[in-house]
Regions:
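N-terminal beta1-alpha1-beta2 submodule of the flavodoxin-like/Rossmannoid cofactor-binding fold
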Residues: 1-62, 160-166
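Glycine-rich phosphate/pyrophosphate-binding loop and the adjoining helix
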Residues: 115-166
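Generic secondary-structure boundary/loop-capping signal
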Residues: 7, 45, 100, 137, ...
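Charged/polar, solvent-exposed surface patches and flexible loops
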Residues: 22, 58-61, 84-88, 117, ...
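Helix-loop-strand module that forms the ligand-binding subsite of alpha/beta enzymes
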Residues: 32-111
Length: 166
């Protein structure tokens, strides 16, 4: 049975992990739960934290197996997929997925709010703004929820392929 592990800060990653686990008939556990030493596939989900994705570090610590990493963030999904930042972080054999998340300024920690204010100020000052820049500016200081469980279809398919179910 596939293993699902996640790290969540504001909740959207946990929502995705639990829904994926439900679809696959397993349980989603946080990073504190060890992954059994078996040959079952592993899907690891975490938010994007600036240039780092905690799921990558966690997945690298696990015994060799089929692994997929899902980065949950607020970059427009089409931009995240075209940039494919995970490609330079993980082996080519790993599955790489990008899921739209949620950002809730109403519950955000003050340090994160300050970081976002700085980033948005820099982006606002750019003379030529991309669609992603405009998106970031428009959601500044607003609770935004882009969670879309249909985005899990590709990960579910990846798992089922590895279990010879498709």
């Amino acid at each position: 049975m596939v293993h699902v592990r996640f790290h969540s800060v504001y909740g959207s990653t946990a929502r995705y992990a639990h829904e994926l686990a439900r679809r696959l008939g397993t349980t989603a556990c946080d990073f504190d739960t060890p992954v059994p030493h078996d040959a079952q596939p592993l899907v690891v989900l975490s938010p994007v934290h600036g240039p780092s994705i905690p799921a990558v570090k966690f997945a690298r610590s696990v015994s060799p197996r089929e692994i997929a990493v899902a980065a949950v963030g607020m970059t427009l999904p089409s931009v995240a997929r075209s940039k494919d930042c995970l490609a330079s972080m993980v082996p080519a054999s790993w599955g790489r997925f990008y899921l739209p998340g949620s950002l809730k300024y109403s519950t955000m920690q003050s340090g994160h709010k300050a970081t976002m204010a700085s980033i948005v100020a820099l982006v606002t000052a750019k003379p030529m703004k991309s669609a992603n820049d405009k998106s970031m500016i428009s959601m500044f200081q607003r609770d935004t929820d882009w969670v879309d469980f249909s985005e899990l279809d590709a990960i579910q398919h990846w798992v089922l392929e590895r279990q010879n179910c498709v």
